Regions:
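Polar, enzyme-active/binding microenvironments
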Residues: 1-224
């Protein structure tokens, strides 16, 4: 419990929790993972029994299982996640792919983080747009954040560093809930995920602080 509380304190102190609509992290049981650290809203629902490994990770089966936040950007009340200020972040433990295809680790149709099969550490991502961009995260697996700060600018932060971005314009939020191990209900994931968060634009400094806080938490709970 102390490690959990220390994590929340660290996330508040760096300002990261204030920009989030949802923040989820692995714990001793699945119920702890499904609780939103931001508040009692958008708690996760397990769909078709995704894998839950206590104090370690969750994973989809690549076909039907995932966690649903219930947060639809078009219907959320006073959302921080909006068209031209939005982020999605995950902490992934694996560098594998979905049988040679993409592993969609989190998101929905217009905002997602997926793992490419072509390159070790390769990431395919988008933030409130219909086209995707590519980046490579040295030292992957790890913590990755895709964040849009303007209508014509979005960046990708990897393990607390700047690893790329694009100037492609936003096209709108998706009328779909944000999910873990899935994006849009037909794009599925298999990788091991230890944390996921989403909200308004997250700065590089905040992403670096989240990365450090998550790693300190994992060490404190004895995560493998």
């Amino acid at each position: 419990m102390r490690a959990y509380n220390d994590l929340i304190v660290a996330l508040k102190q760096c300002g990261a929790l204030a920009v989030c609509d949802g923040f989820y992290v692995i714990g001793a049981d699945e119920q702890a993972f499904t609780r939103n650290l931001v508040g009692d809203i958008y708690n996760l629902t397990a769909v078709n029994a995704p894998t839950y490994a206590a104090d370690n990770y969750v994973a989809g089966n690549g076909t039907t299982s995932y966690y649903d936040t219930g947060a639809n950007p078009t219907t959320m009340v006073s959302p921080k996640f909006v068209q031209d200020s939005a982020h999605l972040g995950i902490w992934s433990l694996t560098n594998n792919n979905n049988a040679g295809a993409l592993s969609y680790d989190a998101g929905n149709a217009n905002t997602f983080i997926a793992r490419t099969a072509a390159t070790s550490g390769g990431v395919t991502f988008r933030v409130n747009r219909t086209g995707s961009a590519l980046a490579t995260l040295p030292g992957y697996p790890g913590h990755i954040v895709v964040s849009r700060s303007a209508s014509d600018l979005f960046k990708i932060w990897g393990n607390g560093t700047d690893i790329g971005g694009a100037t492609t314009a936003s096209t709108g939020v998706s009328n779909q809930t944000l999910r873990i191990s899935d994006a849009s209900g037909s794009l599925h994931g298999v990788n091991q995920i230890r944390a996921m968060h989403f909200g308004s634009h997250m700065t590089l400094a905040q992403a670096a602080a989240v990365n450090a806080a998550l790693r300190a938490y994992a060490s404190a709970i004895g995560a493998p």
